[in-house]
Amino acid sequence: MAHLLLHGTLEATILEADHLSNPTRATGAAPGIFRKFVEGFEDSLGLGKGATRLYATIDLGRARVGRTRVVDDEPVNPRWYEVFHIYCAHFAADVVFSVKAAQPIGATLIGRAYLPVRELLSGEAIERRLDILDAGRRRISHGPTIHVRLQFRDVAGDRHGWGRGVSGARYPGVPYTFFSQRPGCRVTLYQDAHVPDAFAPRIPLAGGGYYRQGRCWEDVFDAISNAKHLIYLTGWSVYTEITLIRDGTRQRPGGDATLGELLKRKASEGVRVLLLVWDDRTSVESLGMKWGFMSTHDAETADYFRGTDVRCVLCPRNPDAGRSAIMGAQIAYMITHHQKTVIVDHDMPVPRGGGSRRIVSFVGGLDLCDGRYDTQFHSLFRTLDTAHHSDFHQPNLDGAAVTKGGPREPWHDIHSKIEGPAAWDVLYNFEQRWRKQGGDKDLLLDLKAMADLIIPPSPVMFPDDGEAWSVQLFRSIDGGACFGFPSTPEAAARSGLVSGKNNTIDRSIQDAYIHAIRRAKNFIYIENQYFLGSSFAWKADGIRPEDIEALHLIPREISLKIVNKIEAGERFAVYVVLPMWPEGPPASGSVQAILDWQRRTMEMMYYDIAVALEAKRINADPRDYLTFFCLGNREVKLNGEYEPAGRPLDGTDYAKAQKARRFMIYVHSKMMIVDDEYIIVGSANINQRSMDGGRDSEIAMGAFQPCHLNTKGLVARGQIHGFRMSLWYEHLGMLHDNFLNPESLECVQRVNKMADKYWDLYASDELNDDLPGHLLTYPVRVTKEGTVTELPGAKFFPDTQAPVIGTKGNLPPFLTT
């Protein structure tokens, strides 16, 4: 049967199944009353197999898109009555409903039912009892059925969403989410941990002003220093020995204090200081030192604060109670808490009598730990005797140390500060997590009782203020990490949550990306640490795509958006900035596996584009529509530069990179800008770990300025536009009028040409000057058929023997996707 595209939203309800039999049990086909008696007897005495535990799933092609809770006591006629709101971008012949019996390890298939996709394309609601068939699609005796209700809404028919952008100030935000959109906020956007005075591009904004860059770690230092009641932090890593203020021209009183000293001082002043730090369960103690596979310093941080007024809780990523034993172990040892937030009380923007305070929150990609401090210059060698002498970070090169010299690994990241009602949502996320895993719940301040000191959630800007923001908070998290999730699927659905096999998930970050991509008009600009997913659409090239389970939709949504624009004869461009390779030795098994997934993702997208171009008989380079970049730096040696006492071993990658004086700039950003009017910033990578909801815990915000939209003949020229232009100035070393229209062919070809040139300079055997810009073409070749291969003569990353396009590995995809 032909596979048809379902691109839109599928509203599905699984009501019940009837006349089921279980082939794995001797009583599996006995009358229902007898089966319930036998199974109940076994269950109560702990004998035999106990009660049959049934659940149902929904599949589209090679992707599982829905799963009910487990029903324990109805072996014949289980009733679920569960509703699913499913974003879909899948080719499939049928919607497949499977009924399964849960086991301690795995599950037993009872049977499957099929509804042809072609019946959904009209958009009419369908309610039907479908025959449940065996694995060979044969009828089963007793005639079991499953009762379902379905309605599909194609994106092309969504007149109020598809391609509409942020359609106006009343745009309500992403639907079906736990947190609503909050108007009347203020947002500050940050590129990197610090911006020196020397980085000052003049970027015009609407109204005649110019864009002003924020300074993240300065603002975090000030916020912590000025807090009077509370400081709440979450982090993948929090390292007590870093200093936040390192720019000698912008010192502050107490700026030489370490983060640990600063937090202890505030706690001693009576401020409630609570930390939730991910507990890396690989951490061990050896020879008096504490080590962990991920080098997060979690045990050191906990020891540092032990016995002080700071309460630091090491927080393991516990699985939701509904997980199987195997899945629970995978989550506990392979999955992380990845949220990065700082929440403080802060003075009012306009002083009020009585010393009233408000809540301010920081959200983004920057952990308060070592290796994160950097500026837009991303030096490899020139800060080794100043800002990075005590903070030398280079995990990609074995044996690297400041005593042996650079290159250090530069760090590019994006963060945000939220003021107004949405800042309280970040606080509420912390409180939910603390109540689940923080221990003493009484340590959380009762802010309702402190309303005379800290005002309740309220706007900090009037809606008609030209600089006001509307902000919505999104998460990836489940009931294993978050207190207070509804216990029933019905209540979970009303709260914008997804219920599964006895677990409840918030995966609104993925929903936010999908929603923003679908509404995009002209262009998308992405910076992210990873870019892989939509594995259901990968080619079966040495793998079984259905085994990979990197099912999130973001790459496929992007390629289908581009295809739609090609078919409509309209321009659209997508720019994606990635690290050259994931952090770690580039030839290692984990890095190579991720690069392989990344290449498969790129190839899936470029194949979609190539097919669309061929169908329209357009002779164009696929990179005119979708183009990938990485960041790198290369520096000539200056007089007076830091001279290390030692040197790396000859012939190593370290020695080669030091001699060539080059290295990648590590892209750790997690950001998407759409049409210069909407932005998502957070901790979530574009991979399954971050977008799943049941794997790494994440947090992000989506925001826009109602007075700076592409509406009523105007072009968005607010803070988001200024931020993108500032990022492009950082990466390209210049500004150009073409950059004002990123969707234009002139712009994308100019940027590609500059990045090609910068890559050639980066990869060259000669070095005469510093690189004029950091944006490098990602070193792959894209054919007109959409195939992705290495560049001619560039099989390996410079100074390594690590293949650019990766190699298939043996590590579990659950870990590397």
UniProtKB/Swiss-Prot annotation:
Chemical reaction(s) catalysed: a 1,2-diacyl-sn-glycero-3-phosphocholine + H2O = a 1,2-diacyl-sn-glycero-3-phosphate + choline + H(+)
Residue stretches making up the C2 domain: 1-130
User: InterPro entries in the record, alphabetically?
Assistant: C2_dom, C2_domain_sf, PLipase_D/transphosphatidylase, PLipase_D_C, PLipase_D_fam, PLipase_D_pln
SUPFAM superfamilies in UniProt: C2 domain (Calcium/lipid-binding domain, CaLB), Phospholipase D/nuclease
List the SMART domains hit by this protein, alphabetically: C2, PLDc
One GO BP on record is: phospholipid catabolic process
The residues covered by the PLD phosphodiesterase domain are: 333-372, 663-690
Catalytic residues, per the record, are: H338, K340, D345, H668, K670, D675
Give me the residues that bind Ca(2+), please. Answer: D192, H378, H412, E730
GO MF terms, alphabetically ordered? calcium ion binding; phospholipase D activity
CDD domains reported in the protein's UniProt record: C2_plant_PLD
Return the protein name: Phospholipase D alpha 2
What is the source species?
Oryza sativa subsp. japonica (Rice)
